[in-house]
């Protein structure tokens, strides 16, 4: 029997579950097809949320064991209980996934547990998790299948010794030596977790810099900070092969520019070279769609070339970020419901949850220079911010880039304490086409780290008062 819906959402990650919830809110009959045992996709289950749980716990452990507590007059002798750390992480994740289930019930979203495949216009077949099969039809179908870790030729992931990001969240022991392949967001965050817990961490990167999408000055500052924390970086390095055994892994390395091969030993290796869209096996050909060479699906305003098929999140162009997927989900469903909806792709913030944190939105200096666009720069260091100084967290800065003529804010780049919670103000400013002067004239509470943003805006015009 064919079950009919207004909307079928394939995938229940941040894009998929938010699309399903918004459809329910708008009174549409909606089904969400997800084969995992829990909702939330990579982000909630094996990505954003568990990694943040370990980042937070490891930061506290490092503060207690590394002298930061003692400096404040708090004397403790911490002992690492890795099993409990992993348990609390899993409990937090379970609570979040149950929360999504509650929201599905609240908004009358039907969760069909299984794996979906398109079967022609308006039709979806589902291989149910319990072994059965279901046939669904809908006027509109939303593909929100997300992404998976990208493989590295010659380095086979087994999640025993050679790990992907999921495996790195489930280790039962602290590595003696963890080698991270890839100096991007995932590699640096997970590498910093295990460094704080006692591992020697070596980061290998093919390029001559870390975080290639990040503003150059910010990236260099982050690398210096992580180096001081004990992480080792080998840039311009190519991994050509890996051999794993019971006791560890042997890697063959070469200079990216060419040269002799050398070996590097580790007891664990994390492959974190990026992610690729999960679009294989979806039956795209049955509706006349094909992914590009990167596996991504083209769209105009989330609408694909196939009638009634929409695409959101990591399967589309742009940064693979949960909040970008959520934004696209809202726009997509509003349009399906016949409402006007737009998304500003120029104002999608990104955050690296290392210590110090990194946050940015908009254009960087390299991008502005490549476009030959004239701009002004305002900087303010956290070493001159009273709250950061009092908290002994004075590393980093905030940088604002504004148009040389109009003063419109073009980009904001932050590295320092708590900047993940501050970048939202910059996003609001840019959404309203604010000028640097607008930020400079806005009263900020004292003493807070957010004052550094105002001072950076003042510095665009050479008027910073506290530096």
Swiss-Prot record:
Entry cofactors: FAD
Residues binding FAD, per UniProt: 34-43, 52, 116, 314, 322
GO cellular component, one term: cytoplasm
Highest taxon above the source species: Bacteria
GO function term, MF aspect, one: flavin adenine dinucleotide binding
Compartments in which it is found: Cytoplasm
EC number(s) reported in the record: 1.8.1.4
Major site of localization recorded for this protein: cytoplasm
Residues given in the record as NAD(+) binding sites: 182-186, 205, 239, 272-275
Keyword Secreted attached: no
Active site: residue positions: 446 (proton acceptor)
Cofactor binding annotation: Binds 1 FAD per subunit.
Catalytic reaction list: N(6)-[(R)-dihydrolipoyl]-L-lysyl-[protein] + NAD(+) = N(6)-[(R)-lipoyl]-L-lysyl-[protein] + NADH + H(+)
Disulfide bonds: 43-48
Enzyme class: oxidoreductase
Keywords: Cytoplasm, Disulfide bond, FAD, Flavoprotein, NAD, Oxidoreductase, Redox-active center
GO BP of this protein: 2-oxoglutarate metabolic process; pyruvate metabolic process
Function (record text): LPD-3 may substitute for lipoamide dehydrogenase of the 2-oxoglutarate dehydrogenase and pyruvate multienzyme complexes when the latter is inactive or missing.
Subunit description: Homodimer.
Family the UniProt entry places it in: Belongs to the class-I pyridine nucleotide-disulfide oxidoreductase family.
Misc. remarks from the entry: The active site is a redox-active disulfide bond.
Full protein name: Dihydrolipoyl dehydrogenase 3
Gene of this entry: lpd3
């Amino acid at each position: 029997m064919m079950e009919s819906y207004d909307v079928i959402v394939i995938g229940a990650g941040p894009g998929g579950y938010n699309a399903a919830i918004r459809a329910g809110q708008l009174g549409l009959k909606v089904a969400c097809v997800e084969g995992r045992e829990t909702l939330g996709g990579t982000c909630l289950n094996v990505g954003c949320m568990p990694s943040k749980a370990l980042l937070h716990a490891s930061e506290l452990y490092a503060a207690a064991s590394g002298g930061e507590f003692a400096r404040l007059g708090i004397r403790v002798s911490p002992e690492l209980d890795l099993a409990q750390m992993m348990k609390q992480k899993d409990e937090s994740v379970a609570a979040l996934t149950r929360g999504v289930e509650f929201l599905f019930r609240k908004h009358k979203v039907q969760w069909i547990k299984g794996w979906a495949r398109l079967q022609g216009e308006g039709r979806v077949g589902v291989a149910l998790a319990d072994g059965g099969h279901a046939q669904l039809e809908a006027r509109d179908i939303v593909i929100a299948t997300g992404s998976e870790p990208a493989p590295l030729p010659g380095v086979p992931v087994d999640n025993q010794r050679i790990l992907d990001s999921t495996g790195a969240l489930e280790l039962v022991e602290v590595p003696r030596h963890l080698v991270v392949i890839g100096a991007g967001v995932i590699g640096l965050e997970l590498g910093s977790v295990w460094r704080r817990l006692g591992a020697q961490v070596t980061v290998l990167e093919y390029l001559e810099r870390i975080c290639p999408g990040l503003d150059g000055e910010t990236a260099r500052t982050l690398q210096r900070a992580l180096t001081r924390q004990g992480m080792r970086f080998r840039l311009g390095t190519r991994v050509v092969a890996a051999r794993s055994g019971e006791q560890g892994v042997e890697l063959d390395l070469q200079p990216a520019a060419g040269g002799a091969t050398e070996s590097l030993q580790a007891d664990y290796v994390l492959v974190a070279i990026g992610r690729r869209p999960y679009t294989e096996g979806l039956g795209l050909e049955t509706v006349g769609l094909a992914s590009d060479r990167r596996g991504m699906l083209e769209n105009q305003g989330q609408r694909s070339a196939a009638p009634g098929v929409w695409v959101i999140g990591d399967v589309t162009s742009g940064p693979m970020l949960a909040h970008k997927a959520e934004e696209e989900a809202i726009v997509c469903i509003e349009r399906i419901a016949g409402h006007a909806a737009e998304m500003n792709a120029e104002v999608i913030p990104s955050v690296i949850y290392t210590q110090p944190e990194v946050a940015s939105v908009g254009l960087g200096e390299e991008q502005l220079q490549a476009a030959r666009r004239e701009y002004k720069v305002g900087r303010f260091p956290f070493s001159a911010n009273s709250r950061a100084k009092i908290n002994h967290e004075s590393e980093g800065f905030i940088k604002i880039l504004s148009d040389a003529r109009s003063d419109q804010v073009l980009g904001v780049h932050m590295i320092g304490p708590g900047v993940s919670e501050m970048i939202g103000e910059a996003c609001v400013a840019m959404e309203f086409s604010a000028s640097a002067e607008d930020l400079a004239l806005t009263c900020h509470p004292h003493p807070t780290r957010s004052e550094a943003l105002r001072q950076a805006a003042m510095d665009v015009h050479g008027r910073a008062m506290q530096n």
